[in-house]
Structure formats: C-alpha cells, structure tokens
Amino acid sequence: MKTHFAIFLITLFLFQMFSQSDAIFKAIWSGIKRLCGKRGLSDLYDLDEMFDGEISQADIDFLKELMR
C-alpha cells in the first residue's frame, strides 16, 4: 500500500510540474510572438502617453478640491 501511495505522489508531482511548465512556455511563446509580430515593435511606445510630467493649474485645482 505504501508503494502505491508513493507512486501516486510521484505521479501527481510530475503531472503538476508538467502542467505548470506548459503554461509558462505558452506565456513566453505568446510574448515572443507579440514582440516579433508586424505591429509588435511599434506598440511599445504606448506607455509614454500614460505619464505626463507637467502638472497644469487645472490639475492642482482638482487636487485641492479632493483634499478638502
């Protein structure tokens, strides 16, 4: 009975390791395909628009309203 349980645990461990590595390989492959695609390299500059280094007077007024 102990042998069956040990074989079951080893099989369960190997199956879990295989299923997790498959998900990691899929994520890596999809990232490579996204970067090397036709529009993959041109989409990298989208993050630059998210940050605006200048704060306008309207932004300061809005923050003052929030802090009241």
UniProtKB/Swiss-Prot annotation:
Amphipathic peptide with antimicrobial activity. The modification Cysteine amide is found at C36. Keywords: Amidation, Antimicrobial, Cleavage on pair of basic residues, Membrane, Secreted, Signal, Target cell membrane, Target membrane. The keyword Transmembrane does not apply. This is Peptide Hp1412. It is found in: Secreted; Target cell membrane. Belongs to the non-disulfide-bridged peptide (NDBP) superfamily. Short antimicrobial peptide (group 4) family. It comes from Heterometrus petersii (Asian forest scorpion). Negative results: does not show antiviral activity. Expressed by the venom gland. Residues 40-68 form a propeptide. The keyword Transmembrane does not apply. Its main location: secreted. Residues 1-23 form the signal peptide. One of its GO terms (cellular component) is other organism cell membrane.
